[in-house]
Amino acid sequence: MLLIKNGRVVDPKSGLDTQADVLVDGKKVVKIAENIDAGDAQVIDATGLVVAPGLVDIHVHFREPGQTHKEDIHTGALAAAAGGFTTVVMMANTNPTISDKETLKEVLTSAAKENIHIKSVATITKNFDGENITDFKGLLEAGAVGFSDDGIPLTNAGIVKKAMELAKENNTFISLHEEDPDLNGVLGFNENIAKKEFHICGATGVAEYSMIARDVMVAYDTQAHVHIQHLSKAESVKVVEFAQKLGAQVTAEVAPQHFSKTEDLLLSKGANAKMNPPLRLESDRQAVIEGLKSGVISVIATDHAPHHADEKNVADVTKAPSGMTGLETSLSLGLTYLVEAGHLSLTELLKLMTSNPSDLYGFDAGYLAENGPADLVIFADKEKRQVTADFKSKAANSPFVGEELTGSVKYTICDGEIVYQV
């Protein structure tokens, strides 16, 4: 047994926010109360710390199979635990892509060896070809939790419609990366800074919000659920809000980098601040924060995208791959740029990182209650820390290295076992 003493116990799902002890027995939380006496249980003193549900990230890239020089499922799991995450959903843009039952089973077999809960989507189209839809029914039966061609937008609207209809038939949903290549220039650079500082045509706002507009209206027509991944533009928030008010079943996520920073970070951090979609303008940053506050955006997801240092450190920054490692800074970015900045309460932040993403997929996760799963994070919500490149991830491609952030994970507990502690 494990007894967590004297913490601030916060459960966004029930609204619980109180000083209490938490008793864990096996894989379950068995009691939440004051002054629990559990005899010979292992004790964690959580005085001055927050005790919350283990975090849930529905958008990570663990690069296995085929790109394990960047990350693998084991190091990805270590990074997740260090960031306070007990449940993650891997994307399918591996090599080969997770487009068939055999590859999916291989990935899930590897994932099952780890000490956190690792799920996976499968691709919408075979090998990301954008034309031939995968076997949704068979892949779901084999363990896929959903479908996404994340990394590559689906340009064929007819395929999007068919995929939505198929997803609806199978009681699931598709998640979409929205950047129309026909309207975009060089990816990873917002159009403003691309023109001004790099003298290139960059990633445009219209490439994002026009594609979102198309897909949310297809969702409205099909009455299927569509999830919009890592939106970054003010107009995108408005389009999603419009569709939701119209009655379309549309959900959306934002990555921490997009509510924390703007395009200027490219000038100081170079390729480590290059990502798809790119960091945008301050007006966009404020708009996605407003979207989180209003509920239009219901999920914070990292888009954890590790790359090898040699790939990022190329002479021509436009040739560097896009993406940043994100699992180990996500909670701190939320605490720093949303809670400390006065935009959200701690409970509101945690809801976006626990129960909301979990409920999207119907996981038994993201809540802290008696008889519930013993998946917890214990953290100091006001402690300052300097981000270093000493990550559990294989990669250190974070533009936040060197920055002082608020919040520090002290323990992560999954299935009743301590999987990370400082």
Swiss-Prot record:
GO biological process, one term: 'de novo' UMP biosynthetic process
Sites where the protein binds substrate: H61, F62, R63, N93, N276, H307
GO cellular component, one term: cytoplasm
CDD domains tied to this protein: DHOase_IIa
Record carries keyword Lipid biosynthesis: no
Catalytic reactions of this protein: (S)-dihydroorotate + H2O = N-carbamoyl-L-aspartate + H(+)
Catalytic residues identified in the record: D303
Binding site for Zn(2+) 1: H59, H61, D150, D303
Free-text cofactor note: Binds 2 Zn(2+) ions per subunit.
InterPro entries per the UniProt record, alphabetical: Amidohydro-rel (IPR006680), DHOase (IPR004722), DHOase/Allantoinase_Hydrolase (IPR050138), Dihydroorotase_CS (IPR002195), Metal-dep_hydrolase_composite (IPR011059), Metal_Hydrolase (IPR032466)
Pfam families to which the protein is assigned, alphabetical: Amidohydro_1
GO molecular function, one term: dihydroorotase activity
EC number annotated for this UniProt entry: 3.5.2.3
Pathway: Pyrimidine metabolism; UMP biosynthesis via de novo pathway; (S)-dihydroorotate from bicarbonate: step 3/3
Known cofactor(s): Zn(2+)
Annotated keywords: Hydrolase, Metal-binding, Pyrimidine biosynthesis, Zinc
Residues annotated for Zn(2+) 2 binding in this entry: D150, H177, H230
NCBIfam families attached to this UniProt entry: PRK09357.1-4, pyrC_multi
Similarity-based family: Belongs to the metallo-dependent hydrolases superfamily. DHOase family. Class I DHOase subfamily.
Protein's job: Catalyzes the reversible cyclization of carbamoyl aspartate to dihydroorotate.
PANTHER family: ALLANTOINASE (PTHR43668:SF2)
Protein name in UniProt: Dihydroorotase
Organism: Streptococcus thermophilus (strain ATCC BAA-250 / LMG 18311)
